[in-house]
Amino acid sequence: MIIFNGLSALPPFNPDDNDENVAKEIADFRQQIRDADGVLICTPEYAHGVPGTLKNAIDWTVSTNEFSKKPTALITASTDGRFGHQALLETLRVIEAENIDELQLLISFIKTKVDDNNTIKDPATLNNVLRLVENLILTIDKHDVGV
């Protein structure tokens, strides 16, 4: 498993710069997506939308198809989260990510479900997260054998 923590290092998306001579950070990000068997996105919702750095990163992959047919799970964990979750699901549809219902989880009122160390303390939430991860692994396995 690789955790990508470099969203803030990616330059703002510019379609005029979207060729093979992109910044090293973009090339590396795209390669990590290509090399991954699957992707798990976990994000808050900001102002009823997708955080800008996440949307920017995804925009860099639109014309190069890194997410196309890639098993991609989405967890939105926020105070509400509904609007950002739906917006990101639409973006995943546009980029043709493989995102079935079993790979989607909305965790509203997240602050009531984690402790001071951000460890999940709510048993139902923990169970839902574990089920989503299991479903992602199953989807990857099916994807690998061409089912």
Regions found by a protein language model. Name each.
Residues 1-12, 64, 96-116:
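Mobile beta-alpha loop/short-helix "lid" or hinge segments that flank ligand
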Residues 1-43, 49-59, 119-147:
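N-terminal beta1-alpha1-beta2 submodule of the flavodoxin-like/Rossmannoid cofactor-binding fold
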Residues 56-64, 91-95:
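A glycine- and small-aliphatic-rich helix-loop capping segment at beta-alpha/alpha-beta transitions
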